[in-house]
Regions:
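Residue-level recognition of specific faces of alpha-helices
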Residues: 30, 67, 94, 107, ...
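Conserved catalytic core of Hanks-type protein kinase domains
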Residues: 6, 58, 111, 133, ...
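C-terminal engagement/docking regions of AAA+ P-loop ATPases
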Residues: 117-177
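An amphipathic alpha-helix signature
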Residues: 61-69, 105, 109, 155
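Canonical AAA+ ATPase core
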Residues: 2, 7-83, 88-98, 138-140
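Conserved AAA+ ATPase small/helical "lid" subdomain
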Residues: 78-130
């Protein structure tokens, strides 16, 4: 619950004392395969708090060789920052201030609502999914150099935002979907 508090509220409570986390604050987590020692599935309500789900895939051959040569070293000393905290905050502010038309709000809500009534889904996208889709679409717009959201921005990130939030029903699984 401490991680969820940090993710949702950007603060943590230790021994009854609440501490604000630094801004910007970002959580990047990995997911081990179910069945691995010590792993348990997260409940849907907790999965829903993760904004996006990405598959990193396997490293390219050359990168895999480098990993072996470095003996899997965990040193972060060679990592160089690609953005400052101040620039990150500016980008976040730009995304927050991006214009969203009434039609775009309606579009996002319709996309998530449609998952709730789909005959092949046991669990559709929550209102939190709509919020995540909106935030990510705004970020996509900023990355493309715009201050307004388009349907293309939404569709560019739709799968990554919804994949971990919707669940197939037994019929869909039986059909191999």
């Amino acid at each position: 619950s401490a991680l969820l508090e940090a993710m949702e509220e950007e603060k943590v409570t230790v021994d009854g004392i609440t501490h604000n986390l630094p801004v910007p604050f970002t959580v990047i987590a990995t997911e081990n395969p179910i069945g691995s020692s010590g792993t348990q599935m997260l409940p849907e309500s907790q999965l829903d708090r993760f904004m996006i789900c990405l598959s990193m895939g396997y490293p390219e051959h050359r990168d895999a060789v480098d990993i072996l040569k470095n003996n899997g070293a965990k040193s972060l000393s060679g990592i160089q920052a690609v953005i400052t905290s101040e620039d990150w905050k500016k980008l976040q502010k730009m995304a927050e201030e991006s214009y969203v038309s009434e039609e775009m709000y309606d579009y996002i809500v319709r996309l998530t609502e449609n998952t709730r009534n789909h005959p092949m889904l046991r669990l559709g996208a929550s209102p939190r999914a709509s919020l995540a889709l909106l935030r990510m679409a705004k970020a996509m717009a900023v990355m493309k150099g715009r201050d307004y959201v388009t349907p293309e921005d939404v569709m560019d990130i739709y799968q990554e935002v919804l994949a971990h939030r919707i669940k197939l029903n037994m019929q869909a699984k039986a059909q191999g979907l």
